[in-house]
């Protein structure tokens, strides 16, 4: 079944509500100041990205913008966009992903409450880092993207 853009936007907002957004570093795009909206819109290809819905930021100014068709991030050097329909896996960056399924010494791994990046692998096995504030904001982004990915399957 083909989902409409309005349906996807409403689902993204619904899931964000479930995670208690907005927070200090996670926002609904429509609630942002006009200057911030304009800055972000100038960073993206609105035709391909769809409607911007959610913005996740870090105190160090990296950001991830969740749109109706793409997720876009910037580390202040480069901007990366990925079609939500192309997401294959979302993985933690806190430890070596080759160790998944094997015993891990938890003393060497950063606590989940300190995680602030996720690794999104696309269908072509390309890998990109996406940003959110540590802890709850990151897990909100992760779960919102998992749901969005399912909407496009």
Which stretches of residues belong to each language-model region?
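Nucleotide-binding motor/catalytic cores of P-loop/tubulin-like NTPases across gene-expression machines
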Residues: 12-16, 88-89, 115-117
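Anionic N-terminal interaction surfaces
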Residues: 1-64, 121-122, 126-133, 139-140, ...
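Phosphoinositide-binding peripheral membrane targeting modules
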Residues: 52-105
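Canonical pleckstrin homology
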Residues: 98-141
């Amino acid at each position: 079944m083909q989902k409409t853009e309005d349906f996807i936007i409403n689902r993204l907002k619904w899931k964000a509500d479930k995670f208690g957004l907005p927070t200090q570093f996670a926002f609904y795009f429509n609630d942002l100041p006009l200057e911030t909206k304009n800055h972000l819109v100038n960073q993206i290809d609105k035709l391909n990205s769809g409607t911007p819905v959610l913005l996740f930021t870090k105190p160090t100014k990296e950001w991830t913008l969740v749109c109706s068709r793409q997720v876009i991030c910037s580390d202040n050097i480069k901007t990366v966009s990925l079609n939500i329909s192309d997401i294959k896996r979302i993985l933690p960056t806190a430890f070596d992903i080759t160790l998944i399924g094997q015993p891990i010494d938890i003393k060497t791994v950063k606590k989940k409450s300190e995680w602030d990046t996720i690794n999104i692998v696309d269908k072509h096995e390309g890998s990109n880092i996406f940003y959110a504030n540590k802890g709850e904001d990151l897990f909100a982004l992760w779960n919102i993207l998992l749901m969005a990915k399912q909407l496009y399957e």
